[in-house]
Amino acid sequence: MKESIFSKKRILLLGSGELGKELVIESKRLGLEVIAIDRYEKAPAMQVADYSRVIEMGDKNILKNVIKEFKPDYVVPEIEALSIEALKELEDEGFNIVPNARTVEITMNRDKIRDLASKDLKIKTAKFDYIFEFDDLEKKADEIGFPLLLKPLMSSSGKGQSLVETKNDLQNAWKQAQANSRGKVKGVIIEEFINFDFEFTLLTVRKENGENIFCLPIGHLQSNGDYQCSWQPLEIKESLIIEAKRMTSRILNNLNGAGLYGVEFFIKGSEVIFSELSPRPHDTGMVTLVSQNINEFELHLRAFLNLPIPRIDLIEPSATRVILSNQEYLNPIYEGLYEALEFEKTKVLIFGKPVSRKGRRMGVVLSSNTDINLARKNADEAALKIKVSTT
């Protein structure tokens, strides 16, 4: 008989942002104990966790010590900026890293996941190369062709990503990528710009027995690589979804760790082009909080806890739109909440970040409707009602 009592299971969350906050909430519903770790105080997930700690997660010894102190049953990374050496050593010592240390390492570095997909598994991607010195950039840019994309090898939420139109833009794009690179890696990936028709996320649950379960595709729009809105379901040809599932299965069969994965694709004509993969709940997947009978955070938990995952159903077509700050505030407040909640079947999530910055994601609006276009319209208009401010 499978173990069914989880009240004494302990999860240590590495990174405590808005996605981590929702994961903690779902963990508490299952009776789990959660420790939330981040590099700053009062991070969103810390506000709902049992315990929290502020540390430098990129320091191997500090990270190992705090994990050994709390002795969690599961170590669950939510971000890329952490010491992979610590996780690999702890896994060798018997700690359970979700989904596993190898997958965390491959997906936190754009070069490793791109090499796995393109070179090892022969999956179609944009043309790309890696540059570690600015002097090599101009020559490689001529080979790739303009416009092109320049990204840090390690970053999150699109930070440091630039669309480079001409040679004159290379210097500034290089500086931007260097300034926003996480960890010790200072190289960049130079990438062909694909004038795609649309992009989407395929949330995929990998079970311990190796089965892959797919959610309905999620459409999304980005600005400078950062998610702005999403909607589910996305209208897309069945043949394209079949190919995306095939590509996803090939990658996950190689990574082979239980959990939820956010897999991003471009569509150009009849081509399916692999973009990126995250081994954890995905920002575009926040729409599943209202669109699905089992949201992405609960799916992640069920997968790595080896709990049953029944059929994933669409409750109703739904959409999201982020709430952005236009400047820096300490202890920000939110105006227009009343007006935003006047929209039918609409919810507002305020993440609770202690400091706002220009362009920082501070919350999200979720809206449902039998008409997906109306759900998107309501989410967009409700988000415009909310202004981040200060007293």
Swiss-Prot record:
Q: Which GO BP annotation is one of this protein's?
A: 'de novo' IMP biosynthetic process
Q: Which residues form the signal peptide?
A: none
Superkingdom field: Bacteria
- E.C. no: 6.3.1.21
**What keywords were assigned to this record?**
ATP-binding, Ligase, Magnesium, Metal-binding, Nucleotide-binding, Purine biosynthesis
List, alphabetically, the GO terms of the cellular component aspect.
Answer: cytosol
- Positions contributing to ATP binding: 110, 151, 156-161, 191-194, 199
Similarity-based family = Belongs to the PurK/PurT family.
Record-given protein name: Formate-dependent phosphoribosylglycinamide formyltransferase
In its UniProt entry, the species of origin is given as Prochlorococcus marinus (strain AS9601)
